Amino acid sequence: MAETIKVRALPQAHCKDCSLAPLCLPLSLTVEDMDSLDEIVKRGRPLKKGEFLFRQGDPFGSVFAVRSGALKTFSITDAGEEQITGFHLPSELVGLSGMDTETYPVSAQALETTSVCEIPFERLDELSEQLPQLRRQLMRLMSREIRDDQQMMLLLSKKTADERIATFLVNLSARFRARGFSAQQFRLAMSRNEIGNYLGLAVETVSRVFTRFQQNGLISAEGKEVHILDSIELCALAGGQLEG
C-alpha cells in the first residue's frame, strides 16, 4: 500500500539557482530575499510513483512546490470513489487548499518519480509579512486556483467529450511551453483512465476521442507520448483557450 511521505531535508539546488524560480517566485525578489526563503524550504528524497505527499484529512502544515515529475490531487467521495481534482506540474504549488479548514481536503499522489520543495506554511506566512511581493505572489497563486476551479466547472457543464479533451491537451501544452518544454510534443504522466476521471468521461470515451483526433490529423499519440499536429484546429475545438 502506498504510504504518506515525510519530506526530509537533503542538499539540493537553492531557490536562486533553480530553473523554475521565474515561474515559482515573484521576479522582484532580491538574492537576499531568496536566501531568506531558501532557509525555510525543505527538500527531500523523490517520491516514487504511487507514493502520497499527503492524504485527505491530514493536518495542514505545509505547501509544496513541484520541482520535477507530476502529482495528481483527488478526493474520496461519500461512495468511496476517487475523484481527481487536478494534475500538478513542475513549479506549481500543491496544498494551499488546506489553509481554510487546517486539514488537506484532498490527497496528493505521485504519478511518476516526483521531487518537491516543502514550505512550512507558518514560516512562509511570517516571511510574506516581511516581503510584500511574496505575499502578492501567494495571492496570485490562490487566485489562479479559484480561476482553475471556475474553468473546470465550465468545462464539465458545457463542453462535449471532444471539447473537454481538446481543452485538456491545449491547457497541458501551454503549461509545458511556460516551463521551457515543447508545446507540441510531450508525455502524459497520467493514464487514460485518470484523464477520464478528471474530465467526467468514461475511459472508453477518452480512447475513442484520442483515436478520432488522430484520424482527423489533430494529434498523433503512442502510449503516453502525444504530438500535437494541428494546434490551431485543436485550440479552436477547445474554444480558443490557450492559457495554462
From Swiss-Prot:
Q: Name one GO cellular component term.
A: cytosol
Gene Ontology annotations of biological process type: cellular response to decreased oxygen levels; cyanide biosynthetic process; regulation of arginine catabolic process; regulation of DNA-templated transcription; response to decreased oxygen levels
Species annotation: Pseudomonas aeruginosa (strain ATCC 15692 / DSM 22644 / CIP 104116 / JCM 14847 / LMG 12228 / 1C / PRS 101 / PAO1)
Q: Remarks, anything else?
A: Possesses 4 cysteines which may bind a metal ion (possibly iron).
User: What protein name is recorded for this chain?
Assistant: Transcriptional activator protein anr
Q: Which GO terms describe its molecular function?
A: DNA binding; DNA-binding transcription factor activity
- Note one Pfam family from the annotation: cNMP_binding
- What CDD domains does its record include? CAP_ED (cd00038), HTH_CRP (cd00092)
Which residues are involved in binding a nucleoside 3',5'-cyclic phosphate?
A: 21-149
| Residue ranges: DNA binding | 192-211
| Family matches, as SMART domains | cNMP (SM00100), HTH_CRP (SM00419)
Keywords, A to Z, come to:
Activator, DNA-binding, Iron, Transcription, Transcription regulation
Q: Which residues form the HTH crp-type domain?
A: 159-232
Q: What does this protein do?
A: Transcriptional activator of anaerobic gene expression.
